[in-house]
Amino acid sequence: MAKEPTKAAHPQPEQTKTNHKAHRPVGGYVLAKDPIEINQGRPRTTLTVRNTGDRPIQIGSHFHFFEVNRYLEFDRSKAFGLRLDIPANTAVRFEPGDEKEVTLVPFAGKRFIFGFNNLVDGWSGDGPTPDYQPNREIAAERAEKLGFKSCKSGGKDAK
């Protein structure tokens, strides 16, 4: 049998007493006193969106709105290069037949968009298109060909 370790062989570190009080528990949050404004200074676009399908559709905060589910009907051309103006890791849900107004903001950074429904797979910025595909017109043609619903609407720029 092994011997029990003795306290002399394994001394405990000396505890020091302080008057220091923790400002927050370990792992606690540090919150700003002022409200946080997301996407500050970015231009906003408001669109009316309708779910024409028979199932609920949920769109996450950073999904390229131009490429959302084909059964959502809205002016897709106005949503090119934009995403929902909601906090990260949140979503907007459209029940069948629902019609809602959503506010969109441009993607930040270099505005390269890949994946989603593969309608864009490239640059989504404004201005002259770089030397590679796609551009807004090609993406719109691809969406129409694949049956993504769209309608011309009175989408507006929000302040």
Curated annotation (Swiss-Prot):
* GO CC field: urease complex
Task: Offer an example of a GO molecular function term for this protein.
Answer: urease activity
Gene3D superfamilies from the UniProt entry: Urease, beta subunit
Q: Where is this region: Disordered?
A: 1-24
- CDD domains, per the entry: Urease_beta
Compartments, as annotated in UniProt? Cytoplasm
The catalytic activity, as recorded, is: urea + 2 H2O + H(+) = hydrogencarbonate + 2 NH4(+)
Pathways involved: Nitrogen metabolism; urea degradation; CO(2) and NH(3) from urea (urease route): step 1/1
Q: Which UniProt keywords apply?
A: Cytoplasm, Hydrolase
Q: Which Pfam families match?
A: Urease_beta
Q: Which InterPro entries match?
A: Urease_beta-like, Urease_betasu_sf, Urease_subunit
Query: Which GO biological-process labels does this protein carry?
Result: urea catabolic process
* Annotated EC: 3.5.1.5
Return the similarity comment.
Belongs to the urease beta subunit family.
Describe its partners and assembly state.
Heterotrimer of UreA (gamma), UreB (beta) and UreC (alpha) subunits. Three heterotrimers associate to form the active enzyme.
Q: What does this protein do?
A: Disrupting the ure2 operon has no effect on urease activity, or pathogen survival in BALB/c mice when inoculated by gavage, but confers slightly enhanced resistance to low pH killing in vitro.
What's this protein's name? Urease subunit beta 2
Q: Which organism is it from?
A: Brucella suis biovar 1 (strain 1330)
